[in-house]
Amino acid sequence: MGLDIVVMERKAVRCPHCGEVINTVDIASTDSGGRLWYDFLERLGYYVPYEKRTEKNDWYGKDMVLDNEQAKQLTDYAMQKEVYNWGGVERVVTEALAHGNKVVINADW
């Protein structure tokens, strides 16, 4: 089984009265995949080899919200390595950052 990754733009929905985040909405997403992603996801702390996996660092199939710097690194990596659908990854990340939204990844392998 190969690695599949979804890159999403996620917007926070805030309460009009207090401004607290009450929900989130996924605005856009794109799919990618392939073994080239393992290196980036391992450096990010998302992918941990099975032997080193604990309950605390097991992100398999879970959403990880990236900060702006990590999101930029994601785009740079996708473009440099020319991963599958790197243009879609660049588009989702660029739009998310332009709109002040979060970039979220979810992968399984």
Give the residues covered by each predicted segment:
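Acidic (Asp/Glu-rich) sequence patches and key acidic residues
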Residues: 1-109
